C-alpha cells in the first residue's frame, strides 16, 4: 500500500498550499487562474482517485486499532479538500451499502429505477444530494446503530459549519476549495454506484454476481486501484485491491455459471454514458464472453435490456433473507 502513502503526500503537496493561497488577498489576475487550476486538478485529476483510496482504507485501515487516530487523517483532514465530508463515506459505504447489498434497505439501491432512464437517474442523484444524509440517519435509527448515525451527522455538520465560517473570510475561496469538490464528488459517486449496479438479475438480486458488474482492461483500474472489479469487491469486501484480477481469473466458471457481466475496454463512466444513450450495441460489444457463456451479440443485448428494468419493492432485504434462512 506504499503507493497510496505516496499518493497522499502528493495530494498534500498540491492542494493544501493552493487552498491557502486561494484564501489570501491575491490580485484577481493571479487568483482566477489559480482557482481554475485548483478546480481542474481537483475535479478531473485527483478527486476520484482520492475517493477510491478512501474506499480502500475504509475497508482495510492503514494503522492498527491502538493507532486508530492516524486513520482519521484521510477522512478528517485531507477529505474535505477532496469533496468528502468526514465520516459520511465510511458510514454510508461500510456501515450501510455493503451490509445491505443494493437491496431494499440500501439507501443507495438502484433496484427500483429504470437504469437507462435519464429521468430516473436525475431523481436518484437529486434525492441523494438533498436527502442522502437524512435517509442514512433514518437507516441507522431503524437498525439501532446510533454510533454511526452520530458520526455521520457530526462529520457532515462540521463540514458545513466550517464552510460557513470560512465563507465570512472569503466565500469565493470556500466555494472553490470545498463546496464545488463536495458537489461534484457526490454526483460522481452516485453516477458510479448507478453504473456498478445497473444490470441486476431480477430473479436473484441478492446474488453479488448478478447485481454488480466488473470492468477490466482499462486504464481506470491502473489509476484507481482496481476499483473496476466490483463483483469480487462485493463477494469479498476485504480482498486486497491487488488481488482482484486473480480472483476473476481463478473463478471464471463461477462468473459464467452466475451470468456475471464483465466489461472490457470501458469504465463505469462509459457504462453510464452509454446507458443514458440506450446504446446497447456499444455496451454489448464490450461484454466479455467468459467461457462461451453467450451464443451471440443479440443474446447479450437482450440480457442487458432485461437487467436494467425496475424491480418492484417486495420487502427483499438482508434481514428478510436471514430470517428466511433461520426458518428453513
Task: Write out the residue ranges for each language-model feature.
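Active-site/pore-lining binding-face segments in mid-to-C-terminal subdomains
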Residues: 196-267
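Transmembrane alpha-helical segments that form the membrane-embedded catalytic/substrate-channel core
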Residues: 41-56, 85-89, 180-206
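Alpha-helix capping/termination and helix-coil
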Residues: 161, 165-172, 183-191, 195-202, ...
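Short, motif-level signal for alpha-helix interfacial/capping segments enriched in acidic residues
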Residues: 28-37, 174-177, 203-219
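Short, surface-exposed loop/turn motifs that are enriched in glycine and acidic residues
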Residues: 173, 177-181, 189, 217, ...
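Non-catalytic, topology-defining segments of multipass membrane proteins
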Residues: 1-61, 66-68, 72, 76-175, ...
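Histidine-centered catalytic micro-motifs
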Residues: 50-59, 89-101, 193-200, 223-239
Amino acid at each position: 500500500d506504499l503507493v497510496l502513502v505516496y499518493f497522499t503526500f502528493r495530494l498534500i503537496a498540491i492542494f493544501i498550499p493552493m487552498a491557502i493561497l486561494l484564501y489570501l488577498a491575491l490580485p484577481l489576475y493571479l487568483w482566477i487562474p489559480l482557482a481554475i487550476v485548483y478546480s481542474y486538478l481537483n475535479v478531473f485529476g485527483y478527486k476520484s482517485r482520492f475517493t477510491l483510496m478512501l474506499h480502500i482504507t475504509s475497508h482495510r485501515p492503514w494503522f492498527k486499532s491502538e493507532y486508530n487516530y492516524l486513520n482519521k487523517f484521510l477522512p478528517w483532514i485531507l477529505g474535505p479538500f477532496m469533496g468528502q465530508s468526514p465520516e459520511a463515506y465510511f458510514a454510508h459505504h461500510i456501515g450501510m451499502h455493503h451490509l445491505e447489498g443494493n437491496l431494499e434497505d440500501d439507501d443507495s439501491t438502484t433496484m427500483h429505477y429504470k437504469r437507462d432512464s435519464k429521468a430516473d437517474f436525475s431523481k436518484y442523484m437529486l434525492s441523494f444530494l438533498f436527502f442522502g444524509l437524512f435517509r442514512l440517519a433514518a437507516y441507522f435509527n431503524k437498525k439501532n446503530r446510533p454510533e454511526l448515525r452520530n458520526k455521520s451527522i457530526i462529520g457532515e455538520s462540521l463540514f458545513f459549519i466550517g464552510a460557513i465560517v470560512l465563507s465570512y473570510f472569503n466565500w469565493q475561496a470556500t466555494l472553490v476549495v470545498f463546496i464545488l469538490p463536495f458537489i461534484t464528488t457526490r454526483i460522481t459517486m452516485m453516477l458510479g454506484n448507478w453504473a456498478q449496479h445497473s444490470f441486476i438479475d431480477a430473479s436473484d438480486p441478492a446474488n453479488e454476481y448478478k447485481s454488480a458488474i466488473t470492468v477490466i482492461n482499462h486504464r481506470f483500474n491502473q489509476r484507481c486501484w482496481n476499483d473496476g472489479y466490483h463483483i469480487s469487491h462485493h463477494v469479498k469486501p476485504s480482498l486486497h485491491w491487488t488481488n482482484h484480477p486473480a480472483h476473476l481469473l481463478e473463478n471464471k466458471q463461477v462468473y459464467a455459471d452466475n451470468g456475471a457481466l464483465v466489461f472490457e475496454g470501458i469504465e463505469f463512466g462509459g457504462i453510464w454514458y452509454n446507458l443514458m444513450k440506450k446504446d446497447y450495441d456499444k455496451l454489448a460489444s464490450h461484454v466479455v464472453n467468459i467461457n462461451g457463456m453467450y451464443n451471440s451479440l443479440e443474446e447479450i443485448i437482450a440480457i442487458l435490456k432485461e437487467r436494467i428494468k425496475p424491480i418492484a419493492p417486495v420487502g427483499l432485504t438482508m434481514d428478510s433473507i436471514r430470517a428466511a434462512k433461520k426458518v428453513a
